[in-house]
Amino acid sequence: MSDKLSYKVADISLADWGRKAIEIAENEMPGLMKMREMYSESKPLKGARIAGCLHMTLQTAVLIETLTAIGAEVQWSSCNIFSTQDHAAAAIAKTGVPVYAWKGETDEEYIWCIEQTIYFKDGKPLNMILDDGGDLTNLVHTKYPQLLKGIKGISEETTTGVHNLYKMKSSGTLQVPAINVNDSVTKSKFDNLYGCRESLIDGIKRATDVMIAGKVAVVAGYGDVGKGCAQALRAFGARVLITEIDPINALQAAMEGYEVTTMDEASKEGNIFVTTTGCADIVEGRHFENMKDDSIVCNIGHFDVELDVKWLNDNAAKKINIKPQVDRYLLKNGRHIILLAEGRLVNLGCAMGHPSFVMSNSFTNQVMAQIELWTNTDKYPVGVYFLPKKLDEAVAAAHLDKLGVKLTKLTDKQAKYLGLDKEGPFKPDHYRY
């Protein structure tokens, strides 16, 4: 362990810039600052050695410093080869937190970075996992199974990682209790929807400077992420087509006025394509061949499996790199495809990801999940769990003052009529918002 690097980032001299930007982000993240205020004295995460695998951004820097402020030891890697913000990584590394992340990692470097977070400086292994997408969870289960007994819990950030946890649970391979942070209302209905509604356009515009108004945009998937993307593209003046497998989501899209069709049909009409599904093989070779000249293709789902990038690389007559994370392919039919971020997350590959305020919702849930799993271990046998509704409401409440929201309070009579506690929870667990 003595040979282990204390950190590896692109450029440690970016730390001062990163620190200034982190201070601005803190002001937009009231939920995380509330966590520090509530728990910095009691330090409920004392003794926790958290290995984190989540986009190393300015917002994540605020999360990391919140975890350390309330007692945890933390080591970090990014969950995407393009998503690290190098000034944020440098700023955190300079504080002494081991960070292994830089923008533009190779796939091999990516795995190396994750592996650096498994053992801490004194040779002791991780005892908590904070994951985004499941790569750290899977690595520990497959390559370091001897460590699983000592791990108290996993908190998982995103839809793809949650799917992975449920697959592991059903196959009997999950060995650690996990909290599904993604499906907290204050995560999925805010980060996934409102975060993507802003950061998708940011990524497309920074990458291409394309005029969206008047274009035909195709959004694959109409879950919370797809809904946010469709709203944004429509607001900029695009005519939006939706593809869906789920009849409920398809009906929702149709009732919102979107045309719902198949990718085989939509690929002939679209100018801009966005995949949001978390599934594989959404845009395949035949779809690329159908597309108009200079169609822009990108993905905002977690992994790069939604677009058949291998087909493009194997079958295009020519590939020209326009600038980092923007490639223009000449197909054999004479038309071009513009691919963003190599088919990986466009909002983080080509822009700065979600704004700080909406990430404060998500990351406050992460902090609560880590505290819950660490301090109430006996409550959680191996399985996948949700945070209680009361905590979900507390996350939302922590963000209201920043927006100038004035909340109505129930009277005793009203609370009795509804059969509720005046302080909540206000909705049953099955309520869908």
Curated annotation (Swiss-Prot):
This is Adenosylhomocysteinase B. The keyword NAD applies. The gene is ahcy-b. Substrate binds at T57, D132, E157, K187, D191. Gene3D superfamilies: Adenosylhomocysteinase-like, NAD(P)-binding Rossmann-like Domain. One of its GO terms (molecular function) is NAD binding. It is an enzyme of class 3 (hydrolase). Disulfide bonds: none annotated. Pfam families: AdoHcyase, AdoHcyase_NAD. Catalyzes the hydrolysis of S-adenosyl-L-homocysteine to form adenosine and homocysteine. Binds copper ions. It comes from the Eukaryota. It comes from Xenopus laevis (African clawed frog). NCBIfam families: ahcY, PRK05476.2-3. Residues 184-351 are annotated as: NAD binding. GO terms for biological process: one-carbon metabolic process; S-adenosylmethionine cycle. Binds 1 NAD(+) per subunit. InterPro entries: Adenosylhomocyst_ase-like_sf, Adenosylhomocysteinase-like, Ado_hCys_hydrolase_NAD-bd, NAD(P)-bd_dom_sf, S-Ado-L-homoCys_hydrolase_CS. Belongs to the adenosylhomocysteinase family. Pathway: Amino-acid biosynthesis; L-homocysteine biosynthesis; L-homocysteine from S-adenosyl-L-homocysteine: step 1/1. The keyword Transmembrane does not apply. It catalyses: S-adenosyl-L-homocysteine + H2O = L-homocysteine + adenosine.
